[in-house]
Amino acid sequence: MPEVPVLACIALDQGKIGNVHQVTSQVIIKKEADMKIALALSGGGFRATVFHLGVLARIAADEQDLFSQVTYLSTVSGGSLCTGLVYSINGFRWPTAKDYLEQIVLTARRMMTTYDLQGSLLRRALRHLGSILETRSDDLSELLREGWGVTAQLHEVPSHPRWLINATCYETAKNWRFEPHRMGDYVFGYSRDTNLPLADALAASAGFPGLIGALALKTGERTWFRYKHSGAEDPYTSLAVQQTWETTPITPAFPEVHLWDGGVYDNHGLEGLHDFSHGWRNNVDFLLVSDASGTSSAPPYRQRVKALYFMVTGIMMDQIRSLRARAVLDRITQHDDDGSYLKIGNSCHKVLTEARRTQDLETYCPMCMDETAVSQAAAFPTMIRKLSQAEFDLLFRHGFEVADYTLYAHHADTSLPARFKFLGYESIRNQIGF
């Protein structure tokens, strides 16, 4: 397929929301027909947040201008925090690849290694001992506004890329999605009144039970509806088409809903992108799943309540994640759906060997993190505390490299929809500044 060079691109000035533009000197190699790329960013605390930042860096570094072709984002917990941080740093607009690599990554590193989100949350709880067992979701939302600058309202987020922020509704046990134009789930119903803080949606998506807890959303303050059209819940039906479908007004079944960590229901954020029967949703050419769920280990036996808690949050959730991951891999390997599954903890040697590219082992593996460092990244605990620079760099580099060698291993020789070269982490060092 011939490639068309584009000599310049438009980039947003840092700190501006689209009023001032400047032409950069970045050279982009643009494909004949752009892909519609969907990103699913999993949960996993700051382990996931930084891993995903590294994955995004690999996409931004690609010569095919893939970053501008990101059309859909579906995020959970740490993935939602990652996306919210990127938007906040860039004035609540999706950045250019150049701005992401040269400005946003370094700013995100500084913020995550100087501001202690978890410590601030704990200090707030200790100041109010009478409510220490209550949900801390409201506190997390406020800290995201104060410490990370997540000050926009949900409805102010641009419609492109289309961003689904996934939570779990306790009352319906379904995947509750926050979008700029609507929120809700197909059992409870939907509301177009999304005049609420973006930080609230992020806090709900990251509200792990027992650690942060649920966001209580009062329903009587908004109008709600259901679609009469059977396919209207498809999140990737165009907004213009959705607005032509008939709706039925409804009275909320509950005066408030409690919205928990999206990872309780679907830690990969796949339900809005993938259907078990039909594969990718409409208008998705390439699905990129970034899975930083972490690795499970065998804990010592726990009795009574602790045993039950592990059964629910450990074994059962791990099985749900495994089933969804297998379904995606089946679509990629056995059907026509194109995409890639990027798993934390996968080393270069493992990925190239499984892809039957053993001839590349001596060339590329020495350029990547060794097995010990990869294992350290995968075993990093699920938390939202301040990171050291070494911790950030470990997780970020691992995310970049997993994306780099996985995309190369499985898409180097194909033209549908993209060919990926191995870039190596050193290729972006000068741009990211560390």
What are these regions (language model features)?
Residues 47, 117-131, 157-275, 429-432:
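Active-site gating loop/helix substructures
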Residues 66, 136-159, 164, 177, ...:
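Conserved N-terminal structural segment that caps and organizes enzyme catalytic cores in eukaryotes
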Residues 32-40, 45-138, 179-181:
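Patatin-like phospholipase
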Residues 45-49, 80-83, 172-174, 266-268, ...:
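Flexible loop/turn segments at secondary-structure boundaries
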Residues 87-93, 178-185, 219, 273-277, ...:
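Short secondary-structure boundary/capping segments
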Residues 253, 259, 264-267, 272-277, ...:
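C-terminal helical/tail subdomains of lipid-metabolizing enzymes
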